[in-house]
């Protein structure tokens, strides 16, 4: 069996992202080595992963650890204050202390919620992330962001809490629905546009091979996307400057998610947001036509949407006012000044926003709705 590869996230408290197959042994080692005297572990998992959670529990129990499974709601429904409260109650009931560890098992919503719970329980306990979706592997699990949603917006309540380790078990991708792979490609393609054009070349060479979890291309894309994020996070953990580039496509994307009450997959919303950001860059005279057009072509090649409701702009603008990058009511977007040259666009004129939105507007219902809902 091929040895796992490791990417070190070199923040003040460095941690590894381990990429491979069959990483149960690595998980046990990461948990037992997280802190001295680990006695209790809480495994937060989403319903489809009950069997996997039990395998993890037994493996930890075999080392003498008192391991507990804690089921949380699937997808964005889990990123709720009431769910976080339930998790805190469980941690209190099982007696989880600062010497103990939390494990997250699931998609991005699971890593966001479990990370938030770990960050706030006793002002911070160790957590090991085991992302099981493509999006979680290349984005949510790496970087230390945690959060829950409120009526005011997505991820507005949260904090930074870095994991002890992230275990990316590629074998889990062979059992997830294809739609999850497609949705996760949005974050990989984003990494290509902001930092690593080789990602774009690999996807464009054979889009279907890029979506094959059993083939050689997707693991390389995952490794490259994680490396991009690791490099950015190491330079700017708390999003004071450089890290904002990871939000490319997310300003409109988060607004779409909120308008759709989180029925759209995150990756689908970000895909539309990427095209919108490219159009903003083009119309602002900062991005060349070929690179702007490349956004739409590559996203459509893997089956992601690139348009949204024509009449939605007023609602989306309202939602974008709560975006974390907005300052004193001034909208701020990440745009490109060329391939792998991210920059910022502050306070764009309303006419520019309207023109960019007209380039992604559609009147009819979206095709391929299965990947959205």
Swiss-Prot record:
GO terms for cellular component: cytoplasm. CDD domains: DHQS (cd08195). Pathway: Metabolic intermediate biosynthesis; chorismate biosynthesis; chorismate from D-erythrose 4-phosphate and phosphoenolpyruvate: step 2/7. One of its GO terms (biological process) is amino acid biosynthetic process. Zn(2+) binds at residues 187, 250, 266. Pfam families: DHQ_synthase, DHQS_C. Its EC number is 4.2.3.4. Belongs to the sugar phosphate cyclases superfamily. Dehydroquinate synthase family. This is 3-dehydroquinate synthase. It comes from Nocardia farcinica (strain IFM 10152).
């Amino acid at each position: 069996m091929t040895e796992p590869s490791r990417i070190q996230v070199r923040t003040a408290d460095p941690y590894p992202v381990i990429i491979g197959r069959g990483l149960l042994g690595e998980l046990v080692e990461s948990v037992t080595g997280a802190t001295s005297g680990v006695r209790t572990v809480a495994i937060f998992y989403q319903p489809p992963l009950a069997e996997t959670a039990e395998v993890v529990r037994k493996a930890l129990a075999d080392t003498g650890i008192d391991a507990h499974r804690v089921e949380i709601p699937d997808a964005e429904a889990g990123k709720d204050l009431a769910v976080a409260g339930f998790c805190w109650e469980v941690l209190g009931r099982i007696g989880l202390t600062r010497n103990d560890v939390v494990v997250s098992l699931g998609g991005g919503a699971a890593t966001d919620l479990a990370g938030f719970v770990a960050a706030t329980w006793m002002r911070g306990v160790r957590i090991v992330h085991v992302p099981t979706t493509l999006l979680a592997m290349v984005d949510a699990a790496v970087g230390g962001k945690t959060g829950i949603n409120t009526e005011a917006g997505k991820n507005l309540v949260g904090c930074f809490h870095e994991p002890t380790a992230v275990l990316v078990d590629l074998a889990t991708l062979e059992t997830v629905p294809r739609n999850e792979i497609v949705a996760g490609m949005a974050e990989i393609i984003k990494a290509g546009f902001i930092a690593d054009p080789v990602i774009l070349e690999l996807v464009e060479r054979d889009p279907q091979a890029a979506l094959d979890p059993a083939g050689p291309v997707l693991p390389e894309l995952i490794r490259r996307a994680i490396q991009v994020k690791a490099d950015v996070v190491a330079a700017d953990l708390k999003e004071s400057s450089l890290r904002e580039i990871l939000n490319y496509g997310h300003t409109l994307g988060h607004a779409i998610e909120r308008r759709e009450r989180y029925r759209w997959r995150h990756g689908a919303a970000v895909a539309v947001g990427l095209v919108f950001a490219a159009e903003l860059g083009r119309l602002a005279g900062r991005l060349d036509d070929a690179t702007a057009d490349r956004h739409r072509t590559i996203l459509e090649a893997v089956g992601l949407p690139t348009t949204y409701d024509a009449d939605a702009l007023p609602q989306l603008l309202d939602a974008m006012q709560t975006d974390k990058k907005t300052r004193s009511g001034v909208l701020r977007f990440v745009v490109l000044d060329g391939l792998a040259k991210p920059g910022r666009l502050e306070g764009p004129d309303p006419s520019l926003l309207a023109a960019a939105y007209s380039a992604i507007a559609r009147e009819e219902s979206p095709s391929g709705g299965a990947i959205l809902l």
